[in-house]
Regions:
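Active-site core segments that coordinate phosphate-bearing ligands/cofactors
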Residues: 1-168
Length: 168
């Protein structure tokens, strides 16, 4: 329903974002023929719009990653300081402000967005997320920035796969 409501057209892509993502594209039958697009979650005739082949891809974790990091950062507030319960709600906003101020360097921490496995490209529920390049000087905003970049590059990997396969 989200793709139809967003006005999906052949060559376009709709990304429904929440705890995970669902990336939806459509193509004309004559453009796809009997070919199966590799590494995506689903390809079904008429599944999105009648008369078109529907394609579904997505990230197994998106908003879940940010919610996890907020809980991680908020744990001391909730369990030790027993402060205002609304303080935890402020964490992501403050991290965003600080992360935007950080310069881009070759020493930045990096992350993989596979915290719930990988849905697309090439589904594998066994792979795991990762944050690397940490030192004792790494700040919470730097880790948050790495997580944001991981979800952005995870999205890019989906876009690139669909382009490689001639769908979007």
């Amino acid at each position: 329903v989200g793709a139809v409501g967003a006005g999906i057209v052949p060559g376009g892509l709709v990304k429904v974002m929440g705890t995970s993502t669902c990336d939806i594209a459509i193509a004309r039958y004559e453009e796809i023929g009997d070919r199966t697009v590799r590494g995506i979650c689903g390809q079904v005739d008429g599944s999105v719009v009648p008369g078109y082949v529907g394609f579904e891809a997505g990230q197994a974790a998106f908003g879940d990653i940010y919610a996890w990091f907020r809980r991680l950062m908020g744990w001391p507030l909730k369990h030790i300081a027993k402060g205002d319960p609304h303080l935890e709600e402020l964490i992501l906003g403050e991290l965003t402000i600080e992360a935007e101020r950080l310069p881009l360097t070759v020493d930045d921490p990096v992350a993989l967005d596979w915290f719930n496995g990988r849905r697309t490209p090439d589904a594998d529920p066994r792979v795991q997320g990762c944050i690397s390049g940490l030192t004792l000087a790494t700040s919470a905003p730097a880790i948050f920035k790495a997580l944001v970049e991981a979800t952005a590059f995870g999205s890019r990997a989906i876009n690139e796969r669909l382009l490689e396969e001639g769908v979007a």
